[in-house]
Design a protein with these regions (language model features):
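DG-centered beta-turn motif at the end of beta-strands
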Residues: 1-8
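Glycine-rich ThDP/TPP pyrophosphate-binding loop and its adjacent helix/strand module
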Residues: 9-26, 30-158
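Conserved small/polar residues in nucleotide/adenosyl-binding loops
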Residues: 162-166
Length: 166
């Protein structure tokens, strides 16, 4: 378990080495999109134009796409989850990651105090849900086992949660 600072920036080299190795390891990244423990500075996990310490005019670069990098190896289980949006999808992703014999990385959208939530951290679950509902954070699962069965390994879960029946 690690934060986005350790996964996208400072410890990225080690993380990349581990997922490239093919070893059976499970990784959970709590993605706050800023360096939370040191006061909310911008990081490689911060989205374009986001305002944080050291990027008062907005971040110029793109957010590093850790999921796409992991998926590019072809042998890494990858999931984007949001604890407030769907606990069922979160549990499904965690179970799939655990059962996968190889590296897995689950990236969890994690609101933090540095986001300046107007109603406080007591509403973090609600904020995590809103991030998915508005399309900011996509819930997805990439399971290489499906590709071996001739199926699409990428499953987007967000649209399934918020599509109304006709």
């Amino acid at each position: 378990i690690g934060g986005d600072g350790a996964s996208y920036d400072i410890g990225y080299g080690g993380l990349d080495h581990v997922i490239a190795s093919g070893k059976d390891v499970n990784i959970l990244v709590l993605d706050t999109e800023v360096y939370s423990n040191t006061g909310g500075q911008s990081s490689k996990s911060s989205p374009t134009a986001s305002i944080a310490k050291f990027t008062a005019a907005g971040k110029h670069g793109k957010k590093k796409d850790l999921a796409a990098i992991a998926m590019s190896y072809g042998h890494v289980y990858v999931a984007y989850v949001s604890h407030g949006a769907s606990q069922a999808q979160l549990l499904k992703a965690m179970r799939e990651a655990e059962s996968y014999h190889g590296p897995s990385i689950v990236i969890a959208y994690s609101p933090c105090i540095n986001h300046g939530l107007k109603r406080g951290m007591g509403k973090a679950q609600e904020q995590a849900k809103l991030a998915v509902e508005c399309g900011y954070w996509t819930l997805l699962r990439y399971d290489p086992r499906l590709a071996q069965e001739g199926k699409n390994p990428l499953q987007v879960d967000s649209c399934l949660l918020y599509t109304s029946p006709s």
